[in-house]
Amino acid sequence: MKSKFFSLLILLILTTSCGKNEHFNDRDNDPVNTSSFHVNNHQILKNNIPFQVKGVVYVPGYPGLLPWEIENSTSLPIALRNSIFNDIQNIKAMGANTIRFWGAPKFCYEALKIVGDMNFIQVIWIQGDAPDFQNPEIKSSTKEYIREVIDRIYSVFHDGSPPLVAITIGNELSESSILSTDAAHPEVHHFSGDYIVTDSNITATEAFIAEMADYARSYEWTTYGHKSLLTYSNEIRTADIIDVPFLDFISHNAYSYAVPYYRPNTASGSSSGTLFQGWIEELKSNHPDQPLLITETGLSISPNASHVGPPNYGYGGNTELEQATGLLQNLHDIQTAALPLAGVCIHEYLDSWWKFGLEDSYSQDPNDIEEWFGIVKLKQQGDWYITEFRSSYDSLKNYW
């Protein structure tokens, strides 16, 4: 579409948007959850109908713009606003029903609202390498950030009903930080808040997540009269040292190449025989009465990494075709797992040139595996950048 058309749509947006095994323990006099999203043993429900998450991770980190610097901006460059709007339209056109946001400026929610018929998962980004999550300063800054993100969402969805699937309280906290926090606070083994009460054998890191989740729910309810589902995104390296069944559902970031490296003794999948399917089945079996959402899966096509190929593929070194076939294999593994899963989010929509800061963001490093996970690539056009679909975009569109 033409830039002028996007600008008119953006003007419309801006003129219509204003300024452990115990679950949530809502007090007896507290109203019922106002969210349209709920859960059963296996699925997330939207308006009491099973809702299979078909998601994509989206970070609007275009060259020269860092996500953590534009997050608070309310006056993004017009070229970036056009690109964000175009990206969200294309994500919807691909067949996705959910975008997983983190570091999202207000305009992302405005664009999602005007595109319509799309949902989102909101990540609360916690300093994952903090040496002590029980540090009062870490708690205070995390709570401040929770307020900022929730306020930003409701400044757009001021009718009080954002299409918010869940708030993710943290993503992949580091193993060293978890272990150091737990070692420093052996006396912390329980949390009791306004909405979350855990059992008495949790760790200090788990108590931190419970406290932040309780705060998010309390702030959202008391400020906006809405209560969203809450989760935490774990990963394979920390699967044995952090567990949060006191949240609404279980989330894991799961990558096919990581399983043979970190869990080589994982049983083969019951249907496809892959280690990836075996791993997600193991995760689900740990909490068979709670939904399991795969909040990230993806493959990097970084050119200078070693090539591995199917069925596990590699951490980088994949061809564009292998990225497409590998992602479809992951979706098939999820779809045919022994117990139903709640869905998946593909990591990620755009290549992330920005991973190592502003100077790095102007070019794509062939040696940096993390910069090449996108299902679309960035191409310079004049003084800005356009996107070009990779094979995986069309493959996902046909699958979904």
What are the roles of these predicted feature ranges?
Residues 224-227, 238-313, 331-335, 341:
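Glycoside hydrolase catalytic-domain groove-lining segments
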Residues 16-32:
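Bacterial Sec-dependent N-terminal signal peptides
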Residues 30-116:
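Active-site-adjacent substrate/metal-binding segments within catalytic domains
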Residues 81-140, 205-208, 212-231, 280:
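Aromatic-lined substrate-binding rim segments of carbohydrate-active enzymes
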Residues 148-203, 231-236, 342-343:
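Active-site groove signature of glycoside hydrolases
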Residues 165, 199-241, 288-303, 339-349:
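Aromatic-lined carbohydrate-recognition surfaces of secreted/lumenal glycan-active proteins
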Residues 75-76, 80-81, 126-153, 193-201:
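Active-site-adjacent "subsite" loops/lids of carbohydrate-active enzymes
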Residues 340-400:
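Aromatic-rich peripheral "rim/lid" segments of glycoside hydrolase catalytic domains that contact
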